[in-house]
Amino acid sequence: MDDCVYCKIANKTIPSYILYEDNDIICVLDILPPSKGSFLIFPKLHIEDYTSLNDEINQKMFTISKYISIILKNKLKFDGLNILLSSGETGQKYKHITIQVIPRFKDDNIKIYFNRFKEDPSFLEELKNYITNELIKMSQNYLNSEKKEEKEEIKKDVDYKSLNQWFEKRI
């Protein structure tokens, strides 16, 4: 996206303080940080919706956030962390998935506040059931696709030596 600051950082059309970069993601120090050492991680591709982010990039983003946090804790001696994932229409100026890691210090005067409300227990129960059932379906679909891939792998290697090795791995 032409007007997205995160895309401009990823494309190196504006300067930044890059902490980590690979083919998929980039991690930079926040130039307008809420606290010392705050940093941002985001995909290089313009992806707006977290639910469309592939698992590999998602895992990379959170893994890098952890390791950079470890390094920063050794340097800055912070007392805690807040990690904020922004996606889609969440009040941000640019609709580009970002993870913002904010080191926290005693008396840093940062306030994170949510307007909370008492949720209806029947809705919570309904939502819990829906989510757990969907997770079971996802898990079954994954296992079925994995079994299908194994069967295709067996068909490719008809030679008995390979077949024997395949059985040995699973015994």
What does each of the following model-derived ranges do?
Residues 1-171:
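HIT superfamily nucleotide-processing domains
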